[in-house]
Amino acid sequence: MIPGEYFIKDGEIELNAGRDTVTLSVANSGDRPIQVGSHYHFFETNPALQFDRAAARGMRLDIVAGTAVRFEPGQTREVQLVALAGKREVYGFRGDVMGKL
C-alpha cells in the first residue's frame, strides 16, 4: 500500500443521503476571489458574497470533503448546500452563531 492510496469499490456512493439541501444563487460583489471550503458554515462566509443568508444558516457546501468552491470577483453561480449534521452546534468561523442552531 502507498501512503494516501485509496481502494475504491465498484458502484456508487451517495453522499449526505437524507439531509436537507437548498440551492442558492451566490454573487461575489468584492474585488478579490473568495474560496469557501467544504465544511465552512456558509451562513458565515465573507460579507462580499451576496445570497439569502437566512436560508444558509446551518448549512455547508454539498461537495466532497476537503474541496472548495471559488467565487471570482463579479461572478454569480448557483451552489447546493446541505444541512450540518451531528449536534448542530456552530462555534468559531466569524463568531455569528457560537452555539446551537
Swiss-Prot record:
Superkingdom to which the source organism belongs: Bacteria
Gene Ontology terms: biological process: urea catabolic process
Pfam family, one: Urease_beta
InterPro entries in alphabetical order: Urease_beta-like, Urease_betasu_sf, Urease_subunit
Intracellular or extracellular location(s): Cytoplasm
GO cellular component: urease complex
Main localization, broad class: cytoplasm
Family the UniProt entry places it in: Belongs to the urease beta subunit family.
Subunit record text: Heterotrimer of UreA (gamma), UreB (beta) and UreC (alpha) subunits. Three heterotrimers associate to form the active enzyme.
Protein name: Urease subunit beta
Organism: Rhodopseudomonas palustris (strain BisA53)
Gene name of the record: ureB
